[in-house]
Amino acid sequence: VDPEKEFAKAHYEQHMKVTGKLAIDGETYEIDAFGLRDHSWGPRYWQNIYSYRWLTCSFGPALNIMVSEIRPNTESRTEGGVVIRDGVLERIVHLNIDSTFDDDRPFHRSMVADLELESGEHVTVEGRVVGFIPLRNRREGHVTHIGEGMTEYKCLGHTSLGISEYLDQVQ
């Protein structure tokens, strides 16, 4: 990939469990949680891709998901991600995300992701956005819309909160 056309350089994601204590103003809070660390080295170039859909959720020790659909342009896309059950990781080899949006704004409100795993198993993830933050990035005459959704997910009998992040170029 041409470095000038990359979206996020040296990007990685890690599902993890975090334990510890957090002290604020003399109060101590115990932390025992699951989540996902998302990191890129250097700046992101939001205008280098046409769109993406990124869904992530930790349901606890039994289930974690990360779903990614990236469209570098209007003609092509990459798809992937993982489903982790009881510590066993399985790759997503094909996916389809059906999303609903506000009528008058490009804000996503819900989605259904049909996932095909490398084993051939099909898994469905349903999401409903319960909190939304619209963002935008402007560079060299381009406007990019990024929507961050706190999302209630349902998958394989589990329900939990996670993130749905959608990026689209504004024409």
Protein language model features and the residues they cover:
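Structured soluble/peripheral alpha/beta segments that form catalytic or ligand/cofactor-binding pockets
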Residues: 1-171
